[in-house]
């Protein structure tokens, strides 16, 4: 039993209409206040028995609270939604002219949101209809811009991005009927060529929209209205009389909403009175047709005509006519009584159904209340959890505030303590100065004497200290100066950058020799690399205090606080004037690194200048390939103007923004998962704070020791325990910064070859270490040896050597790159060349670490050199592909022949075999090209990553150690790597690959698009192949290749969809075409194309070794939907002919049969072709062609019967006319007053005997032969023999069946009304005659 609730809204609150509205069948005037659902405080006795019970509570509104606020909120929500939809609809559908015709857009009038059921589009869906069948749509009313009287009704949908798109459109003139659903308060039916059942979101929206629609109809058609069924006419300001005057009922397909028994009786009576066997005009028409076929006039025809004239003069002169009238009158009375009884039964069923619906509504409301209570409990629980979370956050925030407050108090106490200590120091200084001023005059003489004695004592100490230093074997300064000034040709041994010092007890101050001259190095201006450092000058300031007395007093008085270690480290490091002072206090702890300060103003100015330069450079260097790629992404065409291109770009930007917003929304779901980790981090920070405080306290204990060491005059007098560590450190540093000049000279002259690379890498590693040890302007190191005068010149020498070597590397690599360009290479040779170049990757890393300018020059030279190589390589490849001719006539003939052979095998064995597709070679070349592109992109990106060290984390020393390790795995360039976590490196790699392969991919995509346009059967297999490639590259590091394949897949899919739409439009255009019994080209090519596409798809599936394709492949769904759409469009074109055809299989109109004879033959040939081919294609395809097969079989069955009837009429005109005429008379009379047709002049016994004289057994054979000849002439030369034989067998069986049926009807008529009449042939004669030609 159907429920009264809408199947579209199962889980929403029921808003039922009034009882009076539900119980009304036609136009009843109701008062809104009389609704039984809204009655309050009414006793049960006052309610009629037919109304639902009221006592006990209102079923629709059981709560006693006022709903005025809810109604207001609902109205406001509907108004806001209506306004939003109106603006969006105007913006999307009525703001731009038609891009095809150029016509201005329509003027928007109004709209309403509706819900339709795809399974029940013309009737109310059952309550158990599935939710996936429900589609949200909109009905929009608009007017033509040039004629406000031309109103259109549009059905639109809302896209996922919020835009609207118009689908089907009707003219307002097509609106015939508007019916109101009495059971569903939101449902209504519009009849526009056929019925459409829709539901609005609320009853109020339905009322407002229908009222606007009818008002607009009245204004447009000058007061006329369509048929209004079950509506309150007062809603449209009409009454019954004005409605009868305004309604339009003379249109085809219209049905009056109010049935009149009187009019029915009059119509039936008229028909009964006028139901004479033949009227005069009809007889004249038929007689003229008979005479055209057989011009010889028989006496029977004359008598028949005379009889008709007498009948027209006195229609009631015969008793049989009066009896027939009386009999029909009694039948009409009996029919009226039966209709009254049926109406009473229907009323009882309706009342019972209403009671059952009321019970179901009560159960539904009870269930809704339970769900509402459960939802309220869940919301309350969630609110409590949120409240607890908020309290916990407030407690944590309070703890943080207390901690900050305690820290500020501690800092304030430290500041006050520091100020008190400073005041105390100043007071003591003032007292001391006063005392010293009083005793100054008395102590002047004593002070002078003490100063003289002190100076003498210091001089003696310095001399003894100098002798002590010169006498020590492990004197540090002596060895340091010896290393920097020693001759390279004598006693010191230097080999490969290593130094071995020689100790001596006496140092001779010989004149130092100058370094060797190097041809490749510019003159250093006559200055020696190893100038001697005067020992006496260096020692003169060793014992001088570095800090003044005031600084010492200030540092001794200050306490150690948080952040003081940075201040102290800066002071100590900045105030050390002596070059050896920093070396003398080397400790095991690493000192703080000095930081460079940059003013904010200068930084902002420099950044602004850089940004302006980059903008100018970007505007000047617009890449045409990038611009072409953007246009290709939006699927532009040559016919597009600037507005259409901007519209396409806006759509693509909207899609990108939507995806970006979706990703942002998905981040909100991750937020709560991060909260526990944040709490853990805060807890760990609270645990570290006490440890840090303890560390600061311990650090303050060492501050005094540090200040004591810094304040000593003899800072180089370190403990003997640190001397060995200091010596080892200095020894290592000096060995690092001292390189063999001969080796450097050889480095500049050594050719860059594979055999020389290990030695060159060793020398470059030593040179790089020297740079790092000495320190350069751009590097921040723990120590800086650039201040040593002996190392300044050596550093300049190293820098010049490095500069020359870098220029040499750039030149040599440019030559190697140019050699690649001059070669005629293949794809495999290109991969081997890239693998060979990897041996020079350490040199590229050296350039990257030393000079970014040289590194960028090498990268740019590589891009400039390699791009023409790949472009030339792929130009040849694409030229070879363009030689494929997929649209050759031989290929089409081969496809048709292969299809017929496969059909013949399927008809005999009922199975299909895997065969080689026609376009196998072409598709193999395409996939081979795509596979080559995939391999080369992967190899090139891996090469760029390794050769240019884009994502490498190793320094030069680590890299050459790993690179030269024989146990290390080899570098494989054709390996697909996982997605890289370093996004900056990934972007750089993508840019380098895109610069080379972007033009190639663009040309290749254009070729594929043109190929698919020329031969669309390749598209399904190609999209399937590309989608499989996308799935394999989704989690890989090759982002450019993934984007290129995705873009290519999107373009081919779009071209395939456009081709399908064009074919559908083609089938719609040929729906009225008629051929001379031949198959339409589109109908003939459709199974060929579908078979080729299916075979090529299966071949691609087998070649890629894919077993399971049930899930995740969009291309398969696209292919199935396209096949289904094409087959339905083809069958609809034939169905449209059949619907519009006037052929009547009962042979009542010979002229119509003659006029549509050729169309019947065309329909038979086309429908038979589609039936046979679609049956084969539907095998193992999950029934995607079931609907098309059913439609085309219906067409074939109807046309088959029509064709057989036509042949019988043409071959045996007299006999068929007589038999079917008598049969019609017998069928149209009742059993009470049986009419004897033999009494009629046209159907007399004598007339029948004269007709049967011409039909003997021999004549039957002649007639059957004539039938066969006629059929062979119609279908003998329009198709191959196999299809022709199948079609002829079907038609021959149908003709035999109708001939036998004609004989049986003749035998029945003779047995009832013409007994004694002799038939000179038998049924066996007919069957044997047909069997003779069945296998011919």
Swiss-Prot record:
Sample GO molecular function, one term: phosphatidylinositol-4,5-bisphosphate binding
Alphabetized CDD domains for the sequence: PH_Sec3
Residue stretches of biased makeup (Basic and acidic residues): 429-462
Pfam families assigned: Sec3-PIP2_bind, Sec3_C-term, Sec3_CC
GO biological process: endoplasmic reticulum inheritance; exocyst assembly; exocyst localization; exocytosis; Golgi to plasma membrane transport; protein transport; vesicle docking involved in exocytosis
Superkingdom: Eukaryota
Residue numbers of Phosphothreonine PTMs: 290
Keyword Cytoplasm: no
Stretches assigned to coiled coil: 319-464, 1309-1336
Stored SMART domains: Sec3-PIP2_bind (SM01313)
InterPro entries cross-referenced by the UniProt entry: Sec3-PIP2_bind, Sec3_C, Sec3_CC
Keywords: Coiled coil, Exocytosis, Phosphoprotein, Protein transport, Transport
Cellular component, GO annotation: cellular bud neck; cellular bud tip; cytoplasm; exocyst; incipient cellular bud site; mating projection tip; plasma membrane; prospore membrane
Region (Disordered): 1-74, 252-300, 429-467
Residue numbers of Phosphoserine PTMs: 606
Compositional bias annotation for Polar residues: 31-47, 252-274, 291-300
The keyword RNA-binding is annotated on this UniProt entry: no
Family: Belongs to the SEC3 family.
Known function: Component of the exocyst complex involved in the docking of exocytic vesicles with fusion sites on the plasma membrane.
Note from the entry: Present with 377 molecules/cell in log phase SD medium.
UniProt subunit comment: The exocyst complex is composed of SEC3, SEC5, SEC6, SEC8, SEC10, SEC15, EXO70 and EXO84.
Protein name per Swiss-Prot or TrEMBL: Exocyst complex component SEC3
Organism: Saccharomyces cerevisiae (strain ATCC 204508 / S288c)
Taxonomic lineage of the native organism: Eukaryota, Fungi, Dikarya, Ascomycota, Saccharomycotina
